[in-house]
């Protein structure tokens, strides 16, 4: 292994623990890995002449070592140092102790041996170790050796360095590079290795050409842990002696290094910061920036930098700089500017944050960019420690230059700052903060401790500072390092850990948030100390000599400039920063990331050509121009242009770099502590996004929103300001996350604002930001070109506010209509709050503005809020939702005149109050006669400028004052003329409408049908009829042509007036039924809102000519679908319109096509939306069909009837309860209607439809006749219509009826028929049985009690689940919300044709074909695809079932050859449960015999229950009627007609969809309710257990609710695959977000517990049978590994045929060892049925034998008729059970039952579970469970009690 590689590894392994080797006097500057160290593993290695001095061979290395220090002390070195690196001499004891190290070496001037290789570097893990001081406090300087004298005379012209030591206090130090090798070489070393070489393969020598005054060549970054090295000012480096060679290596630039100037006069003679090596002088003659050392063969550059993860700074630009020419910048705004920009870097000077090594880089890893190449002369993005920031960032002190002040000229500024303009973006590498050593010397430890006490810091803080010895420079850097942010590394690595220990030791306790706030306060106070301020005053401006790193170049303002319309200064290059005023400006990034005044350009927005060109060029280059031609604002007037000026990234706090496309500052510092930047900011900027992309501003670039100057200030984002302040700013509109950085930050004001006409106020953009007028530009305020202005608001406090709390908004308005959202999160004082509100509202001045509390719609304000009230309301009422709303009445605004002297904000169009009277005038005045219409949203304005053409720069300052008044007067005159013209047009428009109305509602001249009734704001005249605005009047020749739309409104206004309120309460998306007259024009205005209360919406044009037909013709429109007849089931497709919803004059369905309902009756293909040009902005979008409907092919002779007018009086109550109470057969007054009697006086269901002759079909009668018998004769009857033109009363322009049908032929009048049909044909809101609104207002005889659960109708009913026969014959009772006779299922799609389920468990009857051939009154021949139920517009469209389309096509195919066959719910259920001849069910059927429960019918029902279809893993969909209707949508069936069936006539397997209907409530439990359900696919009845998580139980936490729902899955998973005759079968489940529906097998009857409570105890034979069945089910469960754990009489269902079934597995548990004690079993179950081991488990668990104990309790319960432990309460029972007592058997039970029964109970009550028998053993061996052949449940007393419970007729 070569020596060089060894040496490289030596450097790479330098210690990072930060312990200064100065502390070890014996270190001697030798590293443990030095080949000259006898204790080093490298000792004895051969050293080539390339690294050793050949002339020093006279001396032996060990001798020299022994002369300096004891050899045995070398081992005490904490780290490893390269031995031949010179250490700093007697002048290094005041080097700053902070910083991450410098890429430049230091030299030991005290060594007697001259060796150019004595360089020191730090390890990758931490700060570079310090060089040993020769005369410092830790070690004396060694005496001079003969090598010094030798090197003075050897090889003068070669690269042998000079060894002359110069006293630091007398003259600049010589670059003594002592080297003590055994021999010294006399030949010049070769040039440094090429870039491809690994780092530190060669160590460059120092050239002796520099003479005795040459020093080492780099700045030095002080350590963060060295208290002995206070910060020191850097002297000015001399100009270079010669240009560097154009070689892309590290040595190419290291030539002609001059001696440094004298050190700082007052500095101690211990430490000095050596300036960086200069580069080639720019052609302009400006002083050069620092460069790397000259051609030295020492290889510290490559190794050092990589050693601690930093980057070497690039050299200054090598290209020819553009000479300074201030003229283009002077003429931008017609005025001169104080400071023009310096020459910019070229585009080649670009390096991104992710450095990609090029051919000229060298070193390990990604390498270090080569120095000296022209193409590398770029602003370093990854290392802002560039030549611009040499002094500030790396630690070299700024030179003492009298001209280097804030008032220096641009040349002076550049000359003094071009070497120190940038800093690194890393906190660890942004070292020196420019603290004068005199100031540091004023803060010894005692004063620091006293200062802490004086500022109310706790004793823990004082102890911490005392223990850490924080004083002087280290103390001041805590708050002022890193661009004013403070030294976070020290705070988090030293101070906070020590403070935590102190707090714990002192007993006060470590409160991290509190101490962090204290730390922020401390840093803020220290920053004030460094700035020379008091905390309460504005920070003093600091000159560049003392400036922190990020205020490097730009001259800052002479004083604070709060409130002044400054122009932000665009710095010309990296490190150049701009000052910014404090007042009334928002900043995009939190605290600007640079609260000390150094704003940087965004890495993304800064394009390569942005620097050094004139403002005109910049504003039009790259992204500077708005693509839509949005005019660039006047640079002097608005401190912004259209370029997307991104915020400076967090690195801005560490230095003002403006590297184009550089993202290192954000990517590396976005999420650092206290930066206030959301974590995703780094990723956003890394992906080259600008804030316009992030905010997704729809108004960007001007053409869809407009970039106008904002009322929030010169720099406010124009994209989120609107002309009327009617929209919230972007910071408010956008969400949290990264966009929260758009927040407004209110800065404190300063007392000395510049004059509005001050030359420092209106500066051109020569140095200004070019982007702040962009669509999402930085919200950072502009700055005048003067001293960098510091904000009062500390950055730390701003960051803490931004991080800790959410934003608070208030809504402010000037005109009651448009509200501006104002972010008041950080505003505390009333004056600031008023100022902020006024700024957001565009008021130039908050003086005199009065603030009132307001609410939406409030127009009167009396008492303004004083300051205390304003602050109190803000604290109490303001929140993130903007609950606090204020109205602001401007104070001294004379006619909205703009006071330029106050603020340039007033010149923004968005500055004006929205909705003000002179909004048009003001906008025209501000936009050069450009007006905006009243309908145009304010936010749609582009970025327009004041008083000039778009994009044309105008003068500012006093010139604006001179030009403003004549212009304003002219604009005001024009605005007044415009207003008069608008009023004239409005009057003409209203007159035209009035004239059209008086002329018989004829269309207006422009073809728009007139409409009236709107008088003033929202005054609607319902008594004045009008034509629909959507109709075209056309001749009456096509009056009888069929139309899809309903006829025009009748002249009778009563229905409209009566139902207006009722229908206005309805939703806006209800479906129109086809049988209704649903499109009548209404007098109601559309739901859309007009722009102004005084303006009518724009004129509407007709959309459909066919709608112009008059009353009779229009009435024919929907008749084809509305006719009743045999072939059309009773209102199947036409029953959708409720009587009190679809009256011809229904006001809710306004204006024909303007109906607010969705036209579900139209085929989607036959409708097209109205063009936007024909619809008023206020009218909702509606669809109109231009295609006439298909007329019915079947015509039936009708009879005419006049609608019953018995219900002329109606109320506006929209409840339709009682309208549809269908009479049941065999009940009181209902029989009369069923028998054909005409109850003439019986009140008809209140409905305006009956008044206007609305038809109803009578296809599904309730009569006793069998509809089949008359089906043939009914087929010959064709429905038709006759028109009665004699209008005997209002509203009867059209009357129609349906032909006589079996149930009503000759027996019912039309009115009676209508009443009967309304019982189930009308729309009904499907309320649950116990929901509100069930009570009916109808007659008591008509009203039924089915509004409640049928289990409550008769208290004599023991069971709550009727047999299936009773269900079939009383379906309308149990499904009250459905029309059970509506044909919704095609016969071919019923289970008879295709298996509805993958599990085709039930065999289909062979006589299906007979049923198919039969036609009844329920067959529909008019049920076509244009109907609601047949179209995809139905509610099933949401299911996206392709089968729906297939079903329609199949029906159409079938319809072309004949009539289709539709089945109703009643038929499906009857077919499922009746295995008879396939005849349609009687409606109602004749009463069965009393023994039907035990007859074959009962057995068939039981058989069908056993074949219940399981629906697990299938798609389960609940079918609900449309809201407000009983009509079901069409049910697309699961069939694949396009796929051929196989030989077995089976369809391919796929996921089946089961659809079910929800019926009555049949049970309630602790955890949910049980409803009757029906599987529409199979016709099976279901018990649907709905368990809904109570939000209160979950505390309103949705996640917790979901967890509770997930817990319910246990029951389903447990029972999914179980199948036993004595267990309730689980058929499926439907999971929802907060509820779950479990589908169970429907078991008629009730629970054993309910039967016991009703009928008393059971006889022993019944108990034995039920016990045997329960035990059989229990044994099955145990075999399956399931513990029931809640077995009791209430959880065992008793069927009406005597079958027992175990149910309720809610707390069941599945286990592998059913009879082994499971310790995880907890106390579950019901107390009185619990086994002893459950109560006293004590961690031992229990087994399935707990169910045996519970079964014994159930047996005792059946014998006694009451629960066990009936005389004890729960607590007492628990106590007794835990003590081993068994449930007492009452004496009457003991005397009545047999000993076998007693022995069974005693066996079950075995206290020891080991002695308790298992279920299988009891079932097989116990005599009580023996099956008895003579047992017949039908012959028992229990059956005699319950046999008459349900009448199945």
UniProtKB/Swiss-Prot annotation:
Q: Which GO terms describe its molecular function?
A: ATP binding; protein kinase activity
Name the source's superkingdom: Eukaryota
Biological processes per GO annotation: MAPK cascade
Q: Where does ATP bind?
A: 1562-1570, 1585
Put simply, this protein is called Mitogen-activated protein kinase kinase kinase mkh1
Q: Which family does it belong to?
A: Belongs to the protein kinase superfamily. STE Ser/Thr protein kinase family. MAP kinase kinase kinase subfamily.
Summarize the protein's role: Mitogen-activated protein kinase kinase kinase, part of the mkh1-mkk1-spm1 MAPK cascade that regulates vegetative growth, conidial formation, colony surface hydrophobicity, osmotic stress, cell wall integrity maintenance, carbon and nitrogen source utilization, chitin distribution, septa formation, and pathogenicity.
Keywords of the record, alphabetical order, are: ATP-binding, Conidiation, Kinase, Nucleotide-binding, Serine/threonine-protein kinase, Sporulation, Transferase, Virulence
Q: What is its EC number?
A: 2.7.11.24
- Per the record, the gene is mkh1
| Disulfide bond residue pairs | none
Give the phenotype of cells or organisms lacking this gene: Does not affect significantly the growth rate but produces fewer conidia. Inhibits significantly hyphal growth upon high osmotic stresses and in the presence of cell wall stress agents such as Congo red, calcofluor white or SDS. Accumulates chitin at the hyphal tips. Leads also to a looser distribution of spacers.
Q: Which stretches are annotated as coiled coil?
A: none
Domain Protein kinase: start-end pairs? 1556-1825
Q: What's the top EC group for this one?
A: transferase
